Amino acid sequence: MTFMVGCDKENFEAVKHVLVGMGKNVFHCGGPGTGEIAKICNNLILGINMIALSEGLSLGEKLGIDPKVLSSIISVSTGRSWCVDTYNPRPNILENVPSSRDYNGGF
């Protein structure tokens, strides 16, 4: 888990030890609200990556490449992203991700 914290430096230093115990990455982004800005920007990039991966896999399949093979290629090439390796939106590429569970809830 990554924490993106927006507050003054003094308050950040006061709570950092608690956050480090809960997450792998802790960043002080600046003043109040900057943590949310960082989160929104990160989520925008994630959304774009998910859309690009979905479109690329669909195009590849329509042109004759097995989506599993194409995902394997992408995961070791310049198109690699967290989406390909950890949260692939294409069903049956990765186990235990929402797309492979018909988007049913659960952890």
Spans of model-derived segments:
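Interdomain hinge/lid region at the active-site interface
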Residues: 32-37, 86-107
